[in-house]
Every structure is written in C-alpha cells, then in structure tokens.
C-alpha cells in the first residue's frame, strides 16, 4: 500500500525517479515537467515529499533549483547521493550493430562520449534521458538507441544492449528531500547532521568577511557557500550555505549569532541527517 506521493522533475524512468524508488519504496513517485511544478505539488499537498537534484559531481549545481529553493517556502528534511549510470537501450530484438543514432539529453550524451565515439553513432538531443526512452518506445526504430537509466528500459519495454556506458564511473548526483511542513521533526541527535541556510549581508564594507568569521572562530565546518543575485539586481546578492552540525550545537549557535549581526536576511532551510555516502572515500 502506498504511503503517500513524492514529486520529482522529469519523465518516469529518470534518475530522479530511481532516487525516489531507492529512498522511499513505499511512496508513489509523481513526475512533473518542470521544477516549478514539482515544487508547487509539494506546497499544495498534492505530494507529501519531493526529491530534487541540486548538484552533480561532473556537471555542477542545478541552477534552476538553487534559484527556486530560497523562496519556495519548503523545508529540507534529508539528502541522498545517487551514483549515476547510463544504459544504452533499443527496441526489442534490435542488434547493437544496426544502431546508427543515439538520443538522450545533452549532458548524458556528453558523459557517454567515449562509447558513442567508439560505436560511431550520431547523436540526437532531447530534454530528458527517460524521455528519449519513452519516445523510442512510442516510435520504434531499429537504427536508433536511447541513453537512459535502467528503470526507463523496464518501464518502456526496451532492451539494454550496453550497460554502464558513462565515461566516468564516480558520477554522482546529490538530491534534497523536501517537505511543505513548516516545522518538520528534527533529526535524531545520534546522527551527524547538515544545516542549510540562506542569508544576505548588510551593505557595509567587508560584511561577508565579518559574517564568516564566527564559523572559523567557533570551529564550524562550512561545506558549501554559493552566491546568487536576487531579482536580477547586482547589488542584492544573497548566499546559500551548508555547515556540519545543527543549530542547537553551541559552536554553530554562536556562529549564527555573529552571522546575523552582519546580515539583513537569514533563514534556515533545513536541518537533516548527513547521508552516509559523505564518508565514502
């Protein structure tokens, strides 16, 4: 029996869909064409959770998400790291030797360049990896293949003719688990935690330098600091940051106190358990 619905951006069979299934096997994944629609589904309660990609070890941050996140009204309650693997799939009965063209989203084609070059395939760009599999299923073509996650082959009745064809095998995407709850239950104190927050410093000389000082003097490990322009204004820069620990920790509480003294805007977006993947070498 389903334990609720979880929103993601993309087609059924996408990497985000696989992440939903792996992390929340009892929930029903719900696909949305855009990140805006996925966020809206969470906010309205149509979906209880969201699985949102924020960065990839090769491609970098997902810019659309970082611009939506600070003003979304949602909270972060978890993170998941997912190794990314791409499969070459065809219509049933098609032999690899017959394939002349491969379709997928541009970033997937780029990350499988070695295999594509070795097989001497032409490329065709589509907006989503799973969409390439869906289109191939709907319009069978013995000369065409798709690059997509394994789940897409299962959903759309395709056959995998080459597995894990990505050039770099440490390709990993980080996802955030989102909720519309204003005050979600705090993570257990037995778990290492991450705190995500946004802030905008006051308009004064060296404000950012001074705002950051409390993290150094209190021994708080900041793992991420990224700047963004708000509403297209070059003078209204705000920052997204992540630190190890939780606001109840004395060291982080002191660092936040100093940060807020030099900031005109500050909001904690979430306190959540650190994924064990972080400790892997």
Placement of each model-derived feature along the sequence:
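Domain-level signature for soluble enzymes in the chorismate/prephenate branch of the shikimate pathway
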Residues: 1-281
